[in-house]
């Protein structure tokens, strides 16, 4: 056979539309009028989704881990045969966050009520794994200060209300150490201005970091992540 333009064929290709389409939605359970009264039934290995809180006026926390260049999402949240069955159990998975880099990270994060991650270039490369943002969120990570980010992981951090910042001067990376206490005063203005002045309380120094976000991404961060943002917007 050959490809033929149907307009050149002497064939009636008209289709008569029915007066109405039969719709059977009897198998669809309509949402309750008051969703607050609905109980979500979860299996023993399915835990509630972690949701961040709206951003406050100031951001402060200790450096929970300092990593080098090209940290992958698999470094951040390993996904091997032992952990895959727990993909819906973020509390359990978080115990293995950065497990291949620093086994003490989860414990350190809990002891300090969360904090900040410091990283080199291309942080979050590789798989677009959302768990690499969800596990740090569950452990209280508020921001990641890196030399540069992999694009998709940066988007996942924003969606979870974790602020991605980039060192203005890469040499400042060497001036920050593990468990240094960092403070960003008036972080709300820093988001709008696209630049944060960060005080290292531990050694008394200051350094700057860019916050390259769109207007919508800023609103998402302020809301504490995309779920909160959507809830606010209705």
For each predicted feature, which ranges?
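Fe-S-dependent hydro-lyases/dehydratases of central metabolism
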Residues: 1-234
């Amino acid at each position: 056979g050959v490809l033929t333009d149907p307009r050149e064929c002497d064939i009636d290709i008209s289709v008569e539309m029915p007066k109405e389409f039969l719709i059977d939605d009897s198998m669809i359970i309509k949402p309750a009028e008051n969703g607050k009264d609905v109980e979500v039934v979860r299996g023993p290995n399915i835990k509630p989704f972690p949701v961040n809180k709206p951003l406050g006026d100031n951001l402060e926390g200790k450096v929970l881990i300092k990593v080098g260049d090209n940290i992958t999402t698999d470094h951040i949240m390993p996904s091997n045969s032992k952990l895959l069955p727990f993909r819906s159990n973020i509390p359990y998975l978080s115990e293995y966050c950065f497990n291949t880099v620093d086994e003490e990270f989860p414990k350190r994060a809990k002891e300090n009520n969360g904090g900040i991650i410091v990283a080199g270039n291309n942080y979050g490369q590789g798989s677009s794994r959302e768990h690499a943002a969800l596990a740090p969120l569950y452990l209280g990570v508020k921001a990641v200060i890196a030399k540069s980010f992999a694009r998709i992981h940066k988007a996942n951090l924003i969606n979870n209300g974790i602020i991605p910042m980039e060192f203005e001067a890469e040499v400042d990376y060497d001036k920050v150490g593990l468990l240094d206490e960092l403070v960003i005063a008036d972080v709300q203005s820093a988001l709008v201005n696209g630049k944060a002045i960060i005080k290292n309380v531990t050694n008394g120094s200051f350094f700057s970091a860019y916050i390259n976000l769109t207007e919508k991404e800023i609103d998402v961060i302020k809301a504490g992540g995309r779920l909160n943002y959507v809830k606010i917007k209705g």
